Amino acid sequence: MAETSNDTPWTVMRLLEWTTDFFRKKGSESPRLDAEILLAHARGCQRIELYTSFDKVPEEEQRVAFRELVRRRGEGAPVAQLVGYREFYSISIRVDENVLVPRPETEHLVIEAIDQIKGRLSDRPSPTVLDIGTGSGAIAVAIAKSLPKTQVTAVDISLTALDIAKWNVENLKLSDRVTLLQSDLFDGLEPDQTFDVICSNPPYISQSEYDELPTTVREFEPRGALLSGPDGTEIIARLLNDSVQRLNDGGQLIIELSPMIAGVSKTLAEQNGGYKEIHLIKDLAGHERILSMQKA
């Protein structure tokens, strides 16, 4: 948004209209929303406050900050990284370049975990949950916040990711019920440690699929949290094989995956022999997104 020599003031409305058009041309899927979030951040206000300020002219310092945010967003930086947080399951989750930005699709994993604990596993007085590849800790804190009697262990191989998860856990005052641990899948756990629910949003992108990801993902989010291997099922196969011994009797394994590998992943689970009631759950777009199963 260039400063012009005419006398037309850069009101909130004009800034939003210009930026929305700019982001639309850049291929943003939500250009108006992006513009509103960034302008609210630059002004230090809630997004809804913009709607009562359309005719106001932000201060020069705010416009300078906004222009920089717009420039970086135009280069592909995710909005969540620019403002430092993302709403997930009605919780504000801190994020940075070391963690994946929580996606709405992952809320279906949280919902499935909560449904299992409230339903079939409701007889367990203090349900235990393992979140593998916790990243920002979004899944772990969402489950813990929703189910006050639940104890959650959240693991990640990345120490920088765990730093962000620690901030989110402490910010939500969940340190007494969410334990963070550096671990490559199950390697860092106690040998006999078992859980009622194991859930994971693991790396599940194949190399060919990764190469086609938009710049905003490929160049700005951690490669190791996305890329699984040539087929995309490498980490999922490990989870299926190793979770059987880590689940309590009747425990539930819940995995987020790409719709492109949903069928083959379900087949792997069926061939494993350690699970029953294996089923896929669709996201709001109708794509098979969650693989859920009970220990046989």
UniProtKB/Swiss-Prot annotation:
Q: Which GO terms describe its biological process?
A: methylation; translational termination
Q: Do the record's keywords include Methyltransferase?
A: yes
- Classify the source by domain of life: Bacteria
- Keywords in alphabetical order: Methyltransferase, S-adenosyl-L-methionine, Transferase
Classification via CDD domains: AdoMet_MTases
Residues holding substrate:
N201, P202, P203, Y204
Which InterPro entries does UniProt cross-reference here? HemK-like, N5-glutamine_MTase, PrmC_N, RF_methyltr_PrmC, SAM-dependent_MTases_sf, Small_mtfrase_dom
The first-level EC class reads: transferase
Q: Where does S-adenosyl-L-methionine bind?
A: G133, T134, G135, S136, G137, D156, N201
Describe the reaction catalysed, as an equation: L-glutaminyl-[peptide chain release factor] + S-adenosyl-L-methionine = N(5)-methyl-L-glutaminyl-[peptide chain release factor] + S-adenosyl-L-homocysteine + H(+)
| A single MF term (Gene Ontology) | protein-(glutamine-N5) methyltransferase activity
**In the Enzyme Commission scheme, what number(s) does this protein have?**
2.1.1.297
Which family is it part of?
Answer: Belongs to the protein N5-glutamine methyltransferase family. PrmC subfamily.
Cited function: Methylates the class 1 translation termination release factors RF1/PrfA and RF2/PrfB on the glutamine residue of the universally conserved GGQ motif.
Q: What protein name does the entry list? A: Release factor glutamine methyltransferase
- Native organism: Rhodopirellula baltica (strain DSM 10527 / NCIMB 13988 / SH1)
